Amino acid sequence: MTLKMDRKALKEEKKKQKLEKFLNKKTTQSKISKAPKPAKNKSSSGYDPMPVEQKWNNYWLSNNLFEPQERSNKFVMCMPPPNITGSLHIGHSMMIAIQDAICRYMRLINYEVLYLPGTDHAGIATQTVVMKQLEKEKKTYNRESFLEATWKWKENYGSRILDQFKRLGTSADFSRQKFTMDAGMNKAVTEAFCSLYEKGLIYRDNKIVNWCCKLQTTLSDIEIDYLSVGKNTILKIDGRDYEFGVIYVFKYPVKFVKDGYESEGHIEVATTRPETILGDVALCANPKDARYTKYDKIIPRNPITEEELSFVFDEAAEMDLESGVLKITPAHDPIDFEIGKKNNLKNIKIFDNQNKIIIEGNYYKLKRLDARDLVVQTLKNKNLFVEKKPYEQVLPMCSRSSDLLEPVIKEQWWCSCSEMAKKAIDAVKTEQIKIYPEESKDDWYRWFENPRDWCLSRQLWWGHRIPAYKTPDGVWTIARNKEQAIQSYKKNNPLNVHYQESDFVQDEDVLDTWFSSGLWPFATLGWPNKNQDLDKYFPTSLLETGKDILFFWVGRMVMMSLELTGKVPFKKVLLHGIVRDAYGRKMSKSLGNVIDPIHVIDGASIETLLDALKLGNLTKENLINAESAVKKDFINGITVCGADALRFTLLSYMNGINDIKLDIERVKGNRKFCNKIWNAALFVKKIVDEIISSDSLSYQDLLNLDLSNEDDKLLVWLIQERNKVISTTHKAFKEYKFMSAVQSIHQFFLYDFCDVYIEIVKKIKTKKYIQACFMVLIDSIKIFSPYMPFITEEIYSQFFDNSLMYTSYPEIIHNKFSTNFKSTLSKIKAIRADIEKYGKEKVDVILDGCECFDKIDIQFISILIPNINTIKFGEGYEVKKVN
């Protein structure tokens, strides 16, 4: 399939053309100019994306065209590394469509572009899916065998993800691809941890963490799903059904002391978690609450253990909520923990790692929610139960296991964020970093003005082991390796120099995944080593990512880069919205509602879509729901759309940080639009080759058309509309308004170039009109190429030997003339509306003689409305059917 038609070639003319091409071509590295072009396919009337995409992917990659080409201006972007938990989904395709469009555009405006790809080890996410897979296969495993299985998983899915990148047309430099657990990344992680520790920013402490019993690890905030629970809702937790969406009110026995007199009574306290009464150490009221501040002293007792409790005051207590008094359980609630720290309260831990009660007595070894029932019954027996009321609540759930998370105190490694956060705020305020869209800056400030310290420890096997070594005396030594740890410890602890190497045991925990990915912009360039790439390409130019990880990832990259390199990691941040399914849910592998971009590119039957769900790690319930949704939404499967149509569609949705509900029908529509581009190019190729054949000209000769002094009304209009598209797309890229860019070129090409200009050229084949037609086709495919790289490269290759990627973006043509051709088009639109009732029957048109139309306008109107029989001027406007 090709546009290229056989033509006679004269030897001398060929030599002349080659010389002209050499003189006119922009300077590129020799490997680009020498890159052999792929063979052209046989002609076909329709565009078939599959062979074209395969051909050009092979060509680009085999000729290393995605590697940076030396230029004075640099543009560097790191790809947010997708997790190796499975295949890419449409959300990743959105990311690639945006980033790759930017990179391809920057090449066209003569920038040296480095686009760095990679993948993330995704600690907890990967460990979860690999364990599920091993359990499916009924395999037993220890840490060593598990890690072996996980590396195999990485090789399988990591390579699959990279293949998907390439199928999407991603112009990243794959010779520099990184993985967050590569040896180089491991060195960077170790150096970063040790450096931050030496700066006093990393410490070990007992604090509240989110504990997942099913996975036996702490979680980061992004791994928590907050479930809104309605009143009196039954949920299956810890293996059985329990009631949630209720609040309990109990009476706490209290002594009130005022002016030396004591009185006894009760304070009613509301809680959604009666089981935690076992760990209560205090009650708390607001310092402005006169009901309690009037007493000299309040002495409560725990209604279960009957131990004496403290009574404290804190603004966290809301005066208008029930009695205005909170129960304080510092070991199992983050707010209570902070109140406990302020008031020097003790921490009573009541759950073990299996969420079972560890306090001796009637509740010992009970599951937490079974203990809840017993606590309620006990307080009923003591006449201390007041009521149970319906209550809407929010529950923290593990996004990986769907377990109800338990706040617990654990000794972990922490990173102090307060000082680093101030630097991150300052970097944005001083515009060292610009955030797009601008409204996201408010979220940035809000988050960094109240930063929480970062829990770094994870009780996992898959990840970067924490470079901390413990000796029998309980001392932790932070070091870059065991040998350094031994030397450091013995220097600081001379009394224990007898410790052997085996006495230094490395922490079993691994670091939070976000720690390694927080180093991504500079570690991918070789940090902590000093090298040419780091000097040349850091800081990077732009970080483009989803709005949902602005703080979890972007913020941490900024903090760590400023602290470890003294520089911002990137100069700009661009955020995009989240791609959601037809029901508004975020696409998630665990829900099974993801769309594989390859299914859209290559097409997929309903059977293929259903089989793909079964290959995942879905729960039985999620599998049933996912299958039902697929059968409803894709009963006939997905037709072949191609990568260009998918990319173009995704960019057409890109409007700030608004979320996106992808409609596959829209992708199919743009697949047809690709065919429109193809057929337009076919026509232009045909008429251009006729001139070349008759006049012995080259394609470059035909592009050497000076329209700056052209006064032909049609050409002046074409120049103006072309110029508008160039200006609009430049502005859109500058402001990252991709919806505006794709709409602009789509409307121009379809409605102005195809529906008007080409239709006129079919009837009026002057050389100048054909030359302009050729010029605008080439300009259009250059403008299309950042969004549709495959079809545009294929079309361009039919005329020229160099890659479209390393040409130049079209420039504005400055033409001083004006034209009334838009009035002609408006009249055509009005006539079409008036003759619609006559169908395809011939009509006579009378134009008002007062309107400014000439013979050329009449000719254009006749061409563009083929069912006009006659057209003439009269005293008024009229359309009538031919008798």
Curated annotation (Swiss-Prot):
GO terms for molecular function: aminoacyl-tRNA deacylase activity; ATP binding; valine-tRNA ligase activity. The keyword Protein biosynthesis applies. A motif ('HIGH' region) lies at residues 82-92. Its EC number is 6.1.1.9. It is found in: Cytoplasm. It holds the Pfam family Anticodon_1. Belongs to the class-I aminoacyl-tRNA synthetase family. This is Probable valine--tRNA ligase, cytoplasmic. It comes from Vairimorpha ceranae (strain BRL01).
